[in-house]
Amino acid sequence: MSTEMMTTEPVPPLELSDDILGKLDPQCSPSDDLSDQFIKDCDLKKKPRKGKNVQATLNVESDQKKPRRKDTPAVHIPPFIPGVISEHLIKRYDVQERIPKAKSGPALHNSDMEQKRPRRKDTPALHMPPFVAGLTLLRDESAGVILEDEEMDGDKLAI
């Protein structure tokens, strides 16, 4: 290893005479348009490579033959009818008998609708104490009616 450091001195440009430049490329002269000549030379030298171009054409053909995802038809599964299950449906679609989620029961459905609907002002709110497992309610803690202040004083207020 040498311990000398490399210097970064500028190197003088290589001086070539006009004779040497003329001998290097007889087709080119300073007055010629190099871009046109370059395009002509490239057109002559273009030869299709067998390996890469053949694979590219095969890929284009295979893309055309393959159906795209948006073109593939959806698999049709018949609508579920409760109580009507055949062995054919079970084998083909792996369908198990189940209750649809939308219709859980008429009693539960009505209570949900009543809670979502705004109640009328003349209807008192029913207070249900929270359910605690293992705890029995005393008589005075049973479900009761809570009247709002407006409802109690409604007759006295004149609007």
UniProtKB/Swiss-Prot annotation:
<feature type="compositionally biased region" description="Basic and acidic residues">
    <location>
        <begin position="62"/>
        <end position="73"/>
    </location>
</feature>
<feature type="region of interest" description="Disordered">
    <location>
        <begin position="1"/>
        <end position="79"/>
    </location>
</feature>
<dbReference type="GO" id="GO:0005829">
    <property type="term" value="C:cytosol"/>
</dbReference>
<feature type="modified residue" description="Phosphothreonine; by PKG/PRKG1">
    <location>
        <position position="72"/>
    </location>
</feature>
<feature type="region of interest" description="Disordered">
    <location>
        <begin position="98"/>
        <end position="127"/>
    </location>
</feature>
<feature type="compositionally biased region" description="Basic and acidic residues">
    <location>
        <begin position="111"/>
        <end position="124"/>
    </location>
</feature>
<dbReference type="GO" id="GO:0004864">
    <property type="term" value="F:protein phosphatase inhibitor activity"/>
</dbReference>
<comment type="function">
    <text>Inhibits phosphatase activities of protein phosphatase 1 (PP1) and protein phosphatase 2A (PP2A) complexes.</text>
</comment>
<dbReference type="InterPro" id="IPR033242">
    <property type="entry name" value="PPP1R17"/>
</dbReference>
<protein>
    <recommendedName>
        <fullName>Protein phosphatase 1 regulatory subunit 17</fullName>
    </recommendedName>
</protein>
<keyword id="KW-0650">Protein phosphatase inhibitor</keyword>
<feature type="modified residue" description="Phosphothreonine; by PKG/PRKG1">
    <location>
        <position position="123"/>
    </location>
</feature>
<keyword id="KW-0597">Phosphoprotein</keyword>
<dbReference type="GO" id="GO:0010921">
    <property type="term" value="P:regulation of phosphatase activity"/>
</dbReference>
<dbReference type="GO" id="GO:0004865">
    <property type="term" value="F:protein serine/threonine phosphatase inhibitor activity"/>
</dbReference>
